[in-house]
Amino acid sequence: MLRYLTAGESHGPALVSVVEGVPAGLPLTAEYINRQLGRRQRGYGRGARMKIEGDAVKFLSGLRDGLTLGSPIALLVENKDWANWSEIMSTHPGARTDEKAVTRPRPGHADLAGAIKYRHADLRNVLERSSARETAARVAAGSVARRLLEELGIRIIGQVISVGGVEAGPLSLAPEELEARLEKSELFCADQAAERRMMAAIDSAREAGDTVGGVFEIRAYGVPPGLGSYVQWDRRLDGRLAAALMSIQAVKGVEVGMGFAAARKTGSQVQDEIFYEQGRGFYRRTNRAGGMEGGVSNGEPLVLRAAMKPIPTLRRPLQSVDLITKEPSSAAVERSDVCAVPAACVIGEAAVAWELAGACLEKCGGDSLAELKDNWDRYLSYVRQV
């Protein structure tokens, strides 16, 4: 069983991920994970903290000589900004908790609900953990899963398709061409004309002291039919992937394939007809289902989209109420981004990679990479013969 936990506060000394269930013998390097961490920090519209943090992972356990051991993998990402917060965020009694205390909850954040739930008088005790800074640890864990998927021939590509109401046009690009174009983009958007308009929307929001959201799309190529299951609700692959994407901070909606547009169509306009060709097997000429039917992958590329709301921390804060005095007040202002949709896209890739890797291990198992690949190859051979 593949699982992970993260720990750490936004301005604490570090973030930690503990990953369990990775087969032994998987080649893995810090450089590989650091590349994904670096992609998470990119993106037009990011805030000042991205200039402070240069995220890099340290392996504390689970590897030797560049190979996984099959034991839990502990990954640490240091917070460079800790030097400025060490006394305020100290774990020892006597921390200067009176400094930079937050008592004015921000609409749209976990501040007020978290304070009520955990009985905190200082909202910093909530926002330090609910912060999207935690996603650096998630990307580190998801990168391990992504590396495993590469060994099985599965490729994950994310792209931003909407920012601030500006929509990218549909493009028919091969995965290699799409990936190359996205790496050159400041917003991970393949439509260059739309990207320029998106950047203008971000600039306008920045000047107005506001923020913008958007939509990102994740595609997974090379996924065979048969991952996931229809026999129980919690084993349905589309449900697991949707939950993983919904767990990302500020994501408010997820769709698969046609998604919500399917509700406005007739059945004959939505389903993907089935064809068969000798040497190719079963295939579809359309992929409106997004690569999954009945909670099971069907052999077509997986296609998911997630909608991210505008970041709720605003330089021109909204109305709030002081937690202590109960007096009307403007919401607190913390350092933040104008747009973090590109970062959310990278986090989405990690989330999808994690769930897919888990589904692959459930299907074919293996305590070592060699055993997993043997089982995987036998299954693919069977699929080709059906």
Swiss-Prot record:
Catalytic activity field: 5-O-(1-carboxyvinyl)-3-phosphoshikimate = chorismate + phosphate
UniProt lineage: Bacteria, Bacillati, Bacillota, Clostridia, Eubacteriales
Pathway: Metabolic intermediate biosynthesis; chorismate biosynthesis; chorismate from D-erythrose 4-phosphate and phosphoenolpyruvate: step 7/7
Identification of the protein by name: Chorismate synthase
Known role: This reaction introduces a second double bond into the aromatic ring system.
Gene assigned in the entry: aroC
Family: Belongs to the chorismate synthase family.
GO molecular function, one term: FMN binding
Annotated keywords: Amino-acid biosynthesis, Aromatic amino acid biosynthesis, FAD, Flavoprotein, FMN, Lyase, NADP
Annotated binding of FMN, by residue: 129-131, 249-250, 294, 309-313, 335
Signal peptide segment: none
Cofactor needs: FMNH2
Organism: Pelotomaculum thermopropionicum (strain DSM 13744 / JCM 10971 / SI)
Domain of life: Bacteria
Record text on subunit structure and interactions: Homotetramer.
Family matches, as NCBIfam families: aroC, PRK05382.1
GO biological process: amino acid biosynthetic process; aromatic amino acid family biosynthetic process; chorismate biosynthetic process
One GO cellular component term: cytosol
Residues annotated as binding NADP(+): 40, 46
